[in-house]
Amino acid sequence: MKRSLSVFLAILVIAAAAVAADEGRFFTYPTIHNDRIVFTYESDLWSVDAKGGVAARLTTFPGTENFAKLSPDGKWLAFTATYDGAPAVYVMPSEGGAPVRLTYNPGGAQVVAWTPDGSEIVFRSMFENVVGRDPNLFSVGVKGGAPVRLPLDRGVLVSFVPEKHQFLFCRRGNEEYYWKRYKGGQYQDIWLYDAVAKTYTPVTDYVGKNSYPMWAGGLMYFVSDRGNGISNLYTQKLGTKDAAPVTKYGDFDVMFPHTDGRSIVYVQDGRIHVLDVASGADTRISVKDPSDRWALRDRVINPKDYIQTAGVADGGQAAVLAARGDVFRVPTGHGPAENLSGTPGTREMYPALSPDGKTVAF
């Protein structure tokens, strides 16, 4: 009887813990290695089993951590953080621990990939970019050192094809542009670099989004909005131009995909999916996050910390300010500020005070 009661209480405790954690959504930048996924949520890094479950927070620093990438052996986690101002590359044990900063270059740094042997981290940066707005790709040792530029004129994404001494890369654009059906001069295309032949070969010819190249299972996987205009996963054999759809979403885009060569993890409709490369099985996993939801709490905010534009008139006796979507009239001497708009559901900006101080245009 006592044993049955103990088992019942244990099950009750586990069930209560599962209920206490809400299923999260709007995750970004997931990375996968075998049975572990790390992602960004509430500007921190979290870890969860690849089959889903309760996530564990890995970082708590007030700055933002994103662009995480698990190392090829799964022991290390590289990511971008804004701990000391400009975004920089950091590395820490994948189980959690003290981050170590690896880059100090101007122009920021966003982690893109690991080299296949796990000795270096590839990142993109405006460092050394004299003309233009496209970043370059660099590598830095896992123990630090001077960054080394990859043999490209420019680049934003990369995926290695180690068995052929090649890598796939995107030369331009930003994969985070959410312009639908964009076909302008900054659309992303995918190229192949051969380190032996020193050649650069275009892989895609679709005028539109060709992004996130990934090498897995002897094929190139990538994201494209060809077809219905929604970004989906596609596969393509190198040496051909024939792309086959893997996912066929018609509502929300496939975003932030990453592969460890066996599985592809991505976000769609704010939720995490895992695609098994060998079988083609695609599963949306349930991620419960035990967050305290601190960002959703009601709190008192001083608008002076959010002043954006200002105007002065009435002989310098008064000023109008725009802060957090409202317009305020503030005396330049003593006296209280007055919220002239007070519309929490509408944003007002660029206020201008009339010469007599009686009317405000915005």
Give residue ranges: language-model regions:
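Positively charged n-region of N-terminal signal peptides that target proteins for export
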Residues: 1-4
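A flexible loop/linker signature enriched in serine peptidases of the S9 family
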Residues: 21, 41-46, 61-66, 78-90, ...
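Residue-level detector of Asp-centered blade-edge/turn motifs that repeat once per structural unit
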Residues: 32-34, 72-73, 116-117, 162-163, ...
